[in-house]
Amino acid sequence: MHYLLSRLLHQRQLNASAQLFNVSHYDVITDMSNTFTCLKEIINDPTYPFNKVDQSVVEIVIARLTAAIRETGSIESYAAELVDVLDEVLKHPMTTLNEKSRDVDSPHCKIASDLLSSLFLHYGKKSVMTLTIPVALKCLNSENAELVKNTTSYISLAAIHNGKSLSSHALQIITKVVKGNYSLIRVLPHIYQDNKEPFHAQLSQLIDLLQNQEVDCSEKLSLLQLASMVANTKPEVLIPYLPRFDVYLLSPQLSTALLNIYMSLISQNRTKALSQFLPTLKLAAQSNEFVNNRTTICKIIANIGRVSSTLASEAVDELVLMARHNLAEPQLLQSVLNEIEAIGSMYPTSLRRHVAFFQTLPSSRTIERILGHLNLNNENIPLEVKKQSTESLLSKNSKVFGNLITSGGRTVFEVCESPTVELCELDRNTHSLAMQYQNNRSSGSLSRRSHASIAHSLGAGTHGPYSDINESRELSMISMPSSSRTNVHLSQAASSSRGHSLPQTFSPQAMTQIQMGKDGRVRPVAGGRRPVQWPAGSTETTFPAHLGPVTTSKMCALNEEDEKWINSDRNDVVYKFVEHRKNKIRRYIGEVNTRFPIPVQCTVEGSKSSKHRMVIHFSCQTRSSPCCVFTKEYLFAFKTKYPAFWLHFMFLQMECSAITQFGEVAGKDSQQYQTLEHCWKCLPSSTTKNVLFDTMITAAFPNSKDQDKLIKELDEAGFFAYFTMDSSNNMWNCISCTNPEKVKYFVEEGGVEKVLEGQLKEKKGRWRFLKRWNTKYFTLSSAALNYSTQHMPTDSRALLPSIDLRSIRSVRSLGRGKKARKSLRKAFEIFTADNTSMILKAKDEKNAEEWLHCLQIAMAHARRELS
């Protein structure tokens, strides 16, 4: 123990305290264990609360010890001793009565506050927090309200990086929350994943806090975030409490978080539980306060509509109303129409009352699919299947087509163009209908040309007659493949005794192709997204329906381009991979985006003589501030060591966006896919391992360990210093949009006011290790970085030598990342456009980070103005 410490602790000589702060830090921390032992003896003395000298000695010694530990970076070595002293202090009362009989902080409380602040200063060190948190939680039982408040703030801060350490105390924390320590609510989402059972057991009491007036909005958002996590993990626990959430759907502050809960339940196939909230969702959709949430509300309403036919009609009515009110917003309108089409594919009757509205919309593929489920010309002719009766089927058909299928005759369709319309999904009763024809064919003397290729179209065209699809039993009319632009010519065979022609408006569209093989089974024709074309040459096919005649169709040969398109589409492995995993991809990308964002752009840098490296670029996702740093003109970029993972994520994000916006999968022929594939091909074989791009992206999704590697890479690149996750809208904001008041000086007119100034030590030149540090006074403004050998007044700053911010190529920390140097933890390096560099060292790490951040922001705004 240092002799000055000994004089203070053993002899209580307060005059030695002034000299103690001039002693070297390393001399102070020598023989620390004896020092702490002496401190505990003084603290536990019964006379300590009344002895002012002892109180002063303890406060001085603790202040000097914590300062020495902090400056020498030895907190991990002495954390156990500090925590032990804190535990001893907490055994004493934290309040005492003053002369006016009021509760005030006791001398022990002051020591506890100092120790807590010193320990939680290192909240990012898990070894320190593992020791500190169990003892700090004891402070929450204190009768001192101020100490409880400060400890709660410390624990909330530590929970960000130490969720596992806190999770073992989850029940204790939940109990404190329920009893009134509402500030601890912010901790709950951080510890749920590591210890779920206490939350499930106490969920009812936690949800009741939403109605408590003392709980502020941010704390309610944390509760809803916790509920969303429960919905993703164990939805059956949350579903009984859903009615309590309904009232918050119309709250502008809480609606987004509640909609996230609903989306989580939908992803877990619990949509039926949300049907009771459809009236409230309709009110939210019609309100102008929830404009930003309309796309999400639209998706939730559509998913509820797919639960039953009754809900389908109600949902379509609301979606059509939403479409009418948002005709000027193409992106939202497209999302609404996609959801309407999805409901219509299951319950076509829900679309009938809105036929006129759909016809007024501009023609598009989505509108064609919607109209493909509607009967525009023959709504008054419902067709039914009665007990699978073939006779009833034929009688109904004859009412529509006349004697299109009759004994002794043959109706021939000559189509001069190949069909160009899209395929719709195969009706679920197509198989039963086809089996009726098969059974009748086998029992009767049917005349047919061939069993080899028998095809027809089932479903309804945009301009063709068809029957509506009922809820439990549907029947699709038989129509020959044709497009709305194809002329249909009917010719009756000479042996036919009577002839009937179809109405002039009849122009059926091919909706679904099926074929009958030699085994007599009817199957959908395999293919891609476009209708199956007929093979080269004139092919005549027959579909036996009853005794006597058969219906025959002739199709012209495909041209070479269409045939090539179909073959490539059928072989599109990427399309098939994504098509079968749509929901999985959307859920996966949603989870990934909460951990880190996905790049908006990738480039490959390098020449023939240098190693190629991929650069990934990120932008601010909200751009809510006019002084936003990372926009389309200027992106946050760095070279990555894991191009395969990033390209895989970019591919999944591309598919997720295509599915969400257009309801379709982006195949290998899309421009975005080809761009990503080109980046992959530009990388060296040592990186790609000669793996094809489509093989790489159709492999298993990157797991949590792979994601941790990317998070570490982002951290080393300084990404999290400039971007933060906004939990209210699940977007990554740049520092300018999160705190616009901090960067306003960079974008103000003039740009000459100082933003940051102070002394920095500088080194220049190639052989920097041979030179000594030169202390200079630097001033950073939005215009330039000025420096001199001494402090200069503002009016003389323009005459100082300066570095143009637009000429700075990059700034990097020398105390962070893989190549960090322990001797330069307080330093950062500036690279300029003329290939020169300058190393600057601040007085401490905090000051170095401040300079680094301000320089990055100033550079970004300078480059944005230049572009």
Swiss-Prot record:
Region Disordered: start-end pairs: 480-505
GO biological process, one term: regulation of signal transduction
MF (Gene Ontology): phosphatidylinositol-5-phosphate binding
A Pfam family this chain is assigned to: PH
Alphabetical keyword list: Cell membrane, Membrane
Cellular component terms per the entry's GO annotation: plasma membrane
Cystine pairs: none
Gene3D superfamilies reported in the protein's UniProt record: Leucine-rich Repeat Variant, Pleckstrin-homology domain (PH domain)/Phosphotyrosine-binding domain (PTB)
SUPFAM superfamilies the record matches: ARM repeat (SSF48371), PH domain-like (SSF50729)
Subcellular location: Cell membrane
Membrane topology of the entry: Peripheral membrane protein
Residue ranges constituting the PH domain according to the UniProt record: 753-860
Family of the protein in this entry: Belongs to the MELT/VEPH family.
Domain notes: The PH domain is required for membrane targeting.
Protein name per its UniProtKB record: Protein melted homolog
